Amino acid sequence: MADEVSAYAAYGKTLPKKQAPKRRQAKRWPKKTTKQTPKTLAKRTAKRASGDKANGQNNGAAAKRQNGVQTKPKAQKLGTHDNASADARRIDSISGSIHCNGVNSNNNNNNSSSSSMPSKKNKGRRSDVSDTEQSESLDDTVNLARKMADYLSECGEQNCGSDADSSGSSYGEYDSSDNDDNMSGESGSASESESCSEDYDKSSGSDSDNECGDGDSDVDCDSDVDCDSDSEGGSAWGSESDDQFSEEYTLNSHANSSSNNNSSNNNSSSNNSNSSASSPEASVMPAAGRRKATKRSEHLASNSDGSDFIDSNNNNKNKNTPPAAKQQKLQVQQRLKQKQLEKQEKRANAAVQRENAAPFCPLQRTATTAAKSCPLPSKEAAGAKPGRKSCPLPSKSAPAANKMAPNKMAAKMCALPPKNERAAQQQRKRAERDEQRQEAKGRRSENELLPEGKQRQQVHLQDSIEEGKRMLHWLINPMTSDDFFSQYWERNACQVKRKQPNYFSQLISFKLIDEMLIRNHLEFTTNIDVTTYKNGMRETHNPDGRAMPPTVWGFYSDGCSIRILNPSTYLIKVRQLCAMMQEFFHCLVGANVYLTPPNSQGFAPHYDDIEAFVLQVEGRKRWRLYSPLHPSDVLARNSSGNYSQAELGEPLFDAVLEPGDILYFPRGTVHQAVCDQQQHSLHITLSVYQQQAYANLLEELMPAVLQRAIKHHLSLRRGLPLHIWQHLGLAKGDQKSELRDELLGNTKRLVQQYLMPSDAQIDAAVDQLAKRFQHEALPPVVLPEEHERTVFGSRSQANSHGQCLCDYELTERTSVRLLRANILRLVAEGSSLRVYYYVDNALEFCKYEANFMEIQPTEAAAVEALMSAYPKYLKVAKLPLRSAERRIEVATALWERGLLMTEQPFK
């Protein structure tokens, strides 16, 4: 029959043909198919053939597979010569399951493309049918296929609505009542599901069919919730690309919910040919390809429709969803849609904000790191806390409240500060600029030319003594150091007033004190004193233990004065100032910090044994100075007790120190200070020249002179006259006799003759004072230029054999010098020579024993040469030692202890 059209061709005429992309093979969850061997097929064919003969040689099998659903035989079997009523019943049975809700597939993936199309199983089973019967059956099949196509097109128009892209081609679930097999295709890329008519072309490109392996379990991916686990080859449902599709589908799915639910009650579902016919744009494909593509697209449409797959445990009997469950699913769908709309609007808001950023907030910042110049919107607009000043992102509730607003209005602009706020900002900026100018001026005065007009050299070429003198000049400028020492040093008090409040602010501040208390372990009495002076009585309120900030500030709030005894241990700027000045003064330069609350006084009137420099850092304080009460108190060697106001006369000096001012007064000067009624006071007292008088030298000198005279002169070792007690003493002081005069004369002659110190003895006494300085001094603050030229910048490492490799090597061509002018002292201790040094001292006062190294007498000349050459560099070859090896050894030993610095860095 040449003009007869096959069922395959009939479907091809109805649907346009499209080229399907190749499918990727899934790496996980492979489909489990039952491979039927020829032997198995032969057995089944023989069995069914015998059954057909027993039933009267019917044209159809005892149990037919229509649309992928195995149905039981009817009482009146339908053959190839049935009339039109049989065709109508067949169409009704097929159309009853086609309501765009499901997809049919059997366990073996052998779905028939049409109930009338001959399958592979029927080929060997119907060998007894004649050619005439086959041609007539083919005619019936063609007619039936055409009727089915017409019916399906009407079904698509009635049930699926006009929007075929979003909801018109959602298919039914796969149902097999005999095997209870539920096979569901997992969703692929969401962007591929925009049109059900392109299910095959788009879904076949992703290998995302996830089947139940054993036929009795199913993988159910509900569209109401997000599936976290995606099948391989497909993307997760609910991705950003399907936002528009899901929105349209959700709006259209409510209109078709009744028809979809009714179609899901049928026990048979549509086959691949029917599903293709329901979509006019679907392309014709082989049966196997259509089965896979249909399962894939139908599951995606089923997910988008919000309907769940039927659980295999209920045997597919309870397919009618209760009204409460439907309502719950609709609510979940609405929430899902709302979330998707919020995401879209947030993206649009972010894009508009980036395009239309406010001038004061060029970058999007979080609330914690936002620019302070951009205040928050009002509380009603943004719902944010009013305390912070920042430019926040739009609140999460804003998109939900303004979902219908255009995207260009979604982003919030950072409002400009009000006029009064801008004025305050300008005032703060001016104050900051003034502070910066004053600090720069202070730095210029600190880094200006030396008083003698000498230009400062590079750091590694500077003289530490001159640097200490420069620091003194920074304290007292515009006064010169020469005028200061000639007019005021150890004579009169001196005040230098400045109109620079931030002149000393880099040294210490209220904030630095608080940080110091938190970061370091300071103890009361050892590091901090808490004092008050009320009604002529000074009291100390030191508790035990560590000085924690709450405790210290609690005392301060109660009107107590806080004294920090060793701030140079914890504050680097104060330490650097003291370390540089001690090189110039050749003695320890200490520092105390006094923090006094308003309208209070912490200490009673007294005098000290130090030369005092008072640096007013913050606030105001009134100072009054008095003359020493006794002549012996002038330049006192020890501090006094507390005086009462009645013991003091009229003050010699009465003035108020303001921030940036400095006050100097000699040791032995009685002083007291009281805070202003409205302002607190923070000042630093630098103490200089403590126990640095001639008396201290003689205390070191005379015992040594006497001991040496006794050792070398016999006259000092002779015994006293027997009658000396009868002529000398307190009771005999008023008597006049020759024996008394003789005894007094002999004693004076011995002192004048044998106790006159020699130059060497005076040198030794000075060395002892210098030795004390080496023990008390602060360690040097090594600058970066010095760091790379000293041992402090050296780094050693090991080679592959575990041997240590040093990154330095001194030779005779290496030029070296001392790190500081007073970094070491050569002292004779008995029969040995020692080199004392302070480079390894602790930051606390005399925490450790003095550091020293013993050298051979022949090596002393090398140390002396280095001390004499300072601040110039000296080549190792010029050290006065006999051999080059010994010169290198001595220089290396001093360099490794941090006492020497090379002219050129090793690295």
From Swiss-Prot:
Fe cation binds at residues 606, 608, 671. Residues 130-139, 208-231 have a biased composition (Acidic residues). The keyword Hydrolase does not apply. It catalyses: N(6),N(6)-dimethyl-L-lysyl(36)-[histone H3] + 2 2-oxoglutarate + 2 O2 = L-lysyl(36)-[histone H3] + 2 formaldehyde + 2 succinate + 2 CO2. Its EC number is 1.14.11.-, 1.14.11.27. Oxygenase that can act as both a histone lysine demethylase and a ribosomal histidine hydroxylase. Specifically demethylates 'Lys-4' (H3K4me) and 'Lys-36' (H3K36me) of histone H3, thereby playing a central role in histone code. This is Bifunctional lysine-specific demethylase and histidyl-hydroxylase NO66. It comes from Drosophila virilis (Fruit fly).
